[in-house]
Amino acid sequence: MTSFKLVKYIPRIKKKKSVLRKLARKVPTDRLLKFERVFKAQKRIHMSVFKAQRVLDEIRWRYYEETVMILNLMPYRASYPILKLVYSAAANATHYRDFDKANLFITKAEVSRSTIMKKFRPRARGRSFPIKKSMCHITIVLNIVKKSK
């Protein structure tokens, strides 16, 4: 005979992302210039989405110089391609738009899934074992901040 336990229903409490964003935000949105943005995307990076997301959560809503310091000190493998992407976005901002690197601010850092590369590894007795290598697309948006008076 099986016995069933009566479990009281406990509603789940959802974490509000807006609260987390407000806590992490360093610059008020009224000081961000609306159309002064630089987009940079890197496609098909050989890395899991979850591993890249862990690093991107740390650099979102930070200044460029602070981001570079954080990424240099992070022990994760995902930090190096993201660091190259941030460097490239800042170089594009200074070269094409004449922005100052001290005023650049990361407003958007997102990662999305890409294709999965499938390979087969030979195993015992003539069998094969599938290997799935996931890839991701990373997008960084740098915004310029007005100087406070």
From Swiss-Prot:
Cystines in this chain: none
CDD domains (UniProt xref): Ribosomal_L22
Localization: Plastid, Chloroplast
Keyword terms: Chloroplast, Plastid, Ribonucleoprotein, Ribosomal protein, RNA-binding, rRNA-binding
Family membership: Belongs to the universal ribosomal protein uL22 family.
Oligomeric and partner information: Part of the 50S ribosomal subunit.
Function text: This protein binds specifically to 23S rRNA.
Name by which UniProt lists this protein: Large ribosomal subunit protein uL22c
UniProt organism field: Agrostis stolonifera (Creeping bentgrass)
Gene field: rpl22
